[in-house]
Amino acid sequence: PIGDIVLATNSNRTIADFLATGHYETRPSIRTLASAMDVGAPSNMERLRHLFPDFGSLRTAVECYPVHDQAIRFQIAKDYSRFGRLWCPHTATGFWVYDNLPESRRLDKAWIVVATAHPAKFNNIVQGIVNLQEIEIPPPLASLLELPVQFESLGTELEAFGEALARWDN
């Protein structure tokens, strides 16, 4: 039921390079505006290779394009100006790739661009790009941010993790 699968990534272009060359090589992560994509050794590569054991079928089914920080900034500003909508940096990568597909391809079918997070989660980035004093936080997110922070520091031993899980389960 799904047509084209077009992925967007940031300057950490491990998957884009793999799909372009067929050669998978991990590398150090590069820090970018789209921080959740700052991965030089993507953990989902094993899943991707399992779903598509034949590289040719993977390359036919999936495309991936890297989007650099300058393009992320441009897309956030452009779409805010055009539509009055704000994107988080991750969502902006998807819209940048979509906007840069050939027009005939974009108009040929319906597309879905997957949004990752609310821009308020990245207000320190987005506010400066669109010159806003404040990004309105939606009530559900605001209520989560008001909850007390709870965490427990654990040692690096597996036993410490098991003990913490046992305490949490009770």
Where are these regions (language model features)?
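PLP-dependent amino-acid enzyme catalytic core
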Residues: 1-170
